[in-house]
Structure formats: C-alpha cells, structure tokens
Amino acid sequence: MELKEVKVFLERLDQDSINFDPHFYKRTIERPVNEGLVRNFLGRIDRLEKIEYGKIGRFKLWFKMSSKYSLVLIVEIKETKELKVVSAWNTNRKWQDKLKG
C-alpha cells in the first residue's frame, strides 16, 4: 500500500474496524496512552502530520497532539480493511526536531 492510500484508508476508517494488538495493552501500562486516545486521533486525520513505512504491512503514523507532543502509532492494515494498532506512544516534538537537525 502506498502512503497516499494509507491516508485515504484512514479517512474512510470505521471505529468498528480498529483492533488492538496485545502488545499495545502491555505497553499502555508503561505509557500515558490508552485506547480512547488512539481511537480519537485515528478519527482526526487533520492532526496527521506524517506517515512512514515500517515492517512489511506496517506504517508509523505521527499525529500532532499539541505544540509540545506528538502521538506515534504503529499500525497494520489488513486486506480485510481492518486496522490493527500494534503500539503507541507520545514523544516530545523538540527532542525529535533536534534528532533531525
């Protein structure tokens, strides 16, 4: 799937088609991220900043949470038109900008 197709897929995504990997729940214990937050941002494509390729069939989605933080999601898009959230975390935008610069 091409990156442009990912955005179109997300725009048409139904909340019932979003599933969460057990790894996601394991990591939410350690991180200030929950299922409701992820579902909220997946429904707000206007906050989507960047899409990157990951492992085969996986993508990294960057959503702008605020001027200080971004929400990063690792997702799999299934042929059945379902989206599986594998992992999620928030990251400091200043820190990310320093890594780029």
What role is predicted for each listed range?
Residues 1-101:
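Ribonuclease/tRNase effector modules and their secretory precursors
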